[in-house]
A protein has these predicted regions:
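Folded extracytoplasmic luminal domains of secretory or organellar precursors
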Residues: 2-116
Length: 116
């Protein structure tokens, strides 16, 4: 009986350690689909022109050009800015045009960077 409980305790310890090791979640900054396009466009323009975001990935023939929608392009740019500057105090707000998600928005050849 003692051996049985020892095995159970070891199994539970193993499960706990395994799940806690995988419990680190990333955060990506993406466009909020509920926000009007004009707000999203203004935030995208600011991030590309003044914010220092990498907007090269959303250009034609680049990995994040497709799908060619405002929300998809804004998500790539907002995340670029957020990942680059979050350790310097940047947030994922963009005049309410963006939100944080713990779900990696990468798709196809378009990789959304995550910096710990």
């Amino acid at each position: 009986m003692k051996s049985f409980w020892s095995r159970i305790a070891i199994a539970l310890l193993f499960i706990t350690v395994t799940f806690s090791a995988k419990a680190e979640f990333g955060q990506w900054c993406v466009a909020d689909s509920q926000i009007p396009d004009y707000v999203t466009q203004a935030a995208l323009d600011w991030a590309c022109q003044h914010g220092g975001a990498d907007c090269s990935k959303i250009q034609p023939n680049q990995p994040c050009f497709l799908p060619n929608t405002l929300k998809d392009h804004a998500s790539v740019v907002f995340n670029s800015y957020y990942q680059s500057y979050k350790h310097m105090g940047a947030d994922c707000y963009f005049s309410s045009a963006a939100i944080l998600t713990q779900r990696d928005p990468s798709h196809g050849s378009c990789h959304f960077e995550y910096i710990k």
